[in-house]
A protein has these predicted regions:
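Substrate-binding clefts and catalytic carboxylate motifs of secreted carbohydrate-active enzymes
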Residues: 35-130
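Hydrophobic faces of well-ordered beta-strands that scaffold small-molecule active sites
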Residues: 9-11, 24-26, 44-47, 99
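Catalytic metal-binding/acid-base residues of hydrolase active sites
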Residues: 5, 14-15, 29-30, 50-52, ...
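Generic structural signal for secondary-structure transition and capping sites
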Residues: 8, 29, 92-95
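Alpha-helical scaffolding within the catalytic cores
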Residues: 13, 26-40
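Short secondary-structure transition/capping segments
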Residues: 22-24, 110-111
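Active-site neighborhood of glycoside hydrolase catalytic domains
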Residues: 1-23, 41, 82
Length: 130
């Protein structure tokens, strides 16, 4: 805050909330997506959600994986779209922001919108992502 007081502070993204900073930040992969009202009036952000795993053979870095499985890009896309609609519906309830996990696959997590080598879009049209 000393360096740039104009930037909001998320003091502990997704970890135990110490009631500090400007954002009430949660990571939510398992529970129903809801907006929590912060007693201090901080902005509520779901700073990680999603995690739908979809391995594309030939475009992974390891054999192991972690996530919530969609077997094919054909099953990945509808699950992703449903999740996006659920997030959109939370804006009117006070959701200030949301961060999908994640843009591209990483080592043991094949839950990106793009594969590890970033050559395969997992069935989502560019205008849908935008």
């Amino acid at each position: 805050r000393q360096e740039d007081p104009s930037r909001p502070v998320d003091h502990a993204s997704g970890w135990f909330d110490q009631k500090a900073g400007d954002i009430c930040s949660v990571h939510n992969y398992f529970r129903d997506l809801v907006v929590e009202k912060d007693p201090a009036g901080r902005a509520f952000v779901i700073s990680e959600y999603g995690g739908i795993t979809c391995r594309v053979p030939g475009h992974v870095s390891t054999e192991g994986t972690y996530g919530y499985h969609a077997e094919t890009t054909e099953t990945f896309a509808p699950r992703f779209h449903a999740l996006m609609e659920e997030i959109r519906s939370l804006r009117e309830k006070g959701l200030a922001g949301a961060v999908y996990t994640q843009v591209s696959d990483i080592e043991e997590e094949d839950n990106g919108l793009l594969t590890y080598d970033r050559t395969v879009n997992k069935g989502l049209l560019t205008d849908t992502i935008n």
